[in-house]
Amino acid sequence: MKRITTAIVAMVIAISAFAQGWQMPPMPENVVYFEHNFNLGQVEGRSYNHAPTFFIYPDSRLDEAAAKALVEEFDMKDVLVANHAAVFVINPVGEKYDNAADFEAFKAVFDRARSGNLKVVGIGNGATFVNTALAPTDAAGHIAGILTIDGKPGKIPAQSWGVPAYVTGKNAAKVAKPYIAMNKAVQTGDRYVNEEEELLAVVVDTTVGAALAEVFDKAWAELFVKNLRFNNYKHTHYEGAKYGQYGPYELEPYTVHEALGIKREIVKLEQYNGLPWLWYEYWPEELMTDAPAASVPVMVLLHGNTNDPRTQAETSGFIQVAGKERFFVVEMEWQGSKDFGAMGYDGVEQVIGILLAKYPQLDPSRVYAQGLSAGSITATALGIRKSYVFAAVGGNCGGIFSGARRGLFSSYDSLWAEATQKRGAVEMPYCSILGTADLVVPFYTKDNYKGNSFLNAWNTYQQMNGMDVTTELDFATDALFGLELADRQTIVTNKGEGIRMETGYFYKGEKPLIKVVAVVDYGHWNFMPAAQVMWDYFKMFSRDPQTKKLIYHGK
């Protein structure tokens, strides 16, 4: 796990540097005030993932005391604390805003903040700078949302990636027009929305003179909380990136489970020896009491190495899928931490058993598992070790590593031996999602595919499922995968510049028992649209609770 550990250390260093801004190189001189609210360790609330960053451009230059007072006037402290957010108050470089100079200053602060959820607020002349210098340029593709108050309108750019915007105050109707145009938005109720990307929205409030606290409350509730914008293209997001280095950032939903009609329960279970166990339950509210027996599927999420145990719920996309399709989700602290005990494979099974016994509406024939990185490695192993528990398993950015493993991870030889013993007697659907630009758990090329962790995982599932095992690859057959996959498909998304997924299956007879999804030029993280792809695959399968045989329901 050396490479995974190295990546996590890099992420922790990056997070720590961000959270302890005073230890980094000096702030650009025009940053007059900085505040962070990075609170690790609490079980309640949300995780630190995709914490918002606010850039506030005031009407005119402020000193530090006035800048702090401005932040207080917005009355945003509760939002900052609840979301681990940071705020920068950024003066014009000169006495007044100069679009060219202040655009360069914006890039300098952007590079330092390394945010994957940047909200930009402009007031008066600061709003005019935002409207005329940031929104019409490629900066729009780096910003998750804009709040513009009392500014003058910008111009409609010839081409734009768009940016969500809340427009209010003087000239609001005029200021909104370029935002509506660049977002290709049409009026839908009380907002303007891009028909192909609902997160590209514009909200127009023509109220003049409203208190800043009232304005911020509305902007947060109606726009800012809806989405994030981060970049995992051609690198991994926690490594950081400079402005413009990897193109436009991808718009994704900012997970707020309550808005999806989902209630979260936090469960701590004391152990006879050692630390308690921790897990998070996510319930579609109507299913908590009124669902028939054995009617609700179970989706188990497993976080990556040393990640917060809310990571997958908040970043994988599965809560959004559950919001639409109404199934139960549980994310477990499977790995353990300083406060909670490690579950391991047996503990994961025990928690599932506890849930099935406690909630008769849960369906024991439809229990699925997905993980990220080390969680993917664990989900992959669970499908072999605990094949009688799950109807299907899968993961993002992790397979089966060759060589000896330590701690909670099984070795390739051990998993291969068990797969061999079960060959032909046990069938387990497996969905493997990977990023081709992942340097933490790398995808293979024609020069290094032997022993690659993804190919190891596919081979091991081929072995257990009684399928032909593909050990030699031919990249003339398929330039990306080097092997012939059935039902090959290219899915072009509206994320970034059109991030695409390449997919295909390994069949056993009529059953598509292995699905492979390569997110092209993507780094080591969840690609949220892939959650729906995985779920659509999972729901083809169930497992008879008595015989433990796999049931294929067809596509």
Sequence positions of predicted segments:
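Alpha/beta-hydrolase
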Residues: I56-P58, I149, L302, N396, ...
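Sec-dependent signal peptide recognition
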Residues: K2-A10
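Alpha/beta-hydrolase active-site loop
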Residues: V93-V120, N131-T132, K338-Q361, S365, ...
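Short substrate-entry loop that stabilizes the transition state in hydrolases
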Residues: Y48-A51, I56-Y97, L287-A342, S402-G403, ...
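A domain-start/cap signature at the N-terminus of enzymes
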Residues: F18-T53, N83-A86, N91-G94, A100-E104, ...
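The feature captures the conserved acid-bearing segment of alpha/beta-hydrolase catalytic domains
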Residues: A139-E197, A392, C397-E510, H524
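Loop/turn elements at helix/coil->beta-strand transitions in domains of secreted/extracellular proteins
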Residues: N49-F54, N83-V87, R114-K119, A139-G145, ...
